[in-house]
């Protein structure tokens, strides 16, 4: 009986998948100054854990491009230390100055752009311009939120929801009832 319960518990925990985690990044007046790699740009890093797998990105942002800069020039890169990653250009089709809001999400897995972080676990973000208008500094500003979905390499098993626990406990109860009934029948 104890071996049966142990086997059932092992099976329950072995069938759970790794849990996705999210990183929500609040943006408040994050300026975009120059081309990628410029020391003037805003660069952030977040430690998500060694070899974490980046699986999705969502954004809800308001961008302002100062004339003569265009909204389509504001870019943020999401990269590993080894520079694997993606570029996000929310206003890609908007070739004008001014302010506009953009919101969307994407599964990087579904579009074949998912990537893993390096052993240092750092996700790097750089806010930059795809074309630097030298006559204006900064070229633009970001406000809103960016959300990164990822799976840590060492994610533990999922924690069952209450309904799952109830179903699992009911199953254990039935196994116990059957074992007791069998034992009474043999006595």
Give residue ranges: language-model regions.
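A short, hydrophobic C-terminal helix/tail in secreted or cell-surface proteins
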Residues: 158-180
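Mature extracellular "passenger" or substrate-interacting domains of secreted, surface-exposed proteins
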Residues: 21-157
């Amino acid at each position: 009986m104890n071996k049966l319960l142990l086997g059932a518990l092992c099976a329950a925990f072995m069938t759970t998948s790794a849990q996705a985690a999210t990183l929500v990044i609040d943006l408040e007046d994050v300026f975009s100054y120059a081309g990628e790699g410029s020391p003037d740009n805003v660069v952030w890093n977040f430690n998500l854990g060694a070899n974490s797998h980046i699986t999705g990105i969502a954004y809800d942002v308001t961008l302002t491009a100062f004339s003569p800069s265009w909204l389509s020039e504001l870019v943020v890169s999401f990269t590993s230390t080894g520079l694997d990653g993606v570029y996000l250009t929310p206003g890609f089709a908007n070739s004008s100055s001014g302010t506009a809001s953009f919101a969307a999400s994407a599964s990087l897995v579904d579009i074949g752009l998912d990537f893993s972080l390096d052993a240092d676990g750092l996700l790097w973000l750089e806010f930059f311009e795809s074309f630097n208008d030298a006559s204006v500094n900064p070229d633009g500003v970001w406000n809103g939120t960016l959300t990164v979905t990822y799976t840590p390499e060492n994610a533990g098993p999922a924690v069952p929801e209450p309904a799952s626990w109830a179903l699992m406990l009911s199953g254990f109860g039935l196994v116990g009832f059957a074992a007791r009934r069998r034992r009474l029948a043999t006595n």
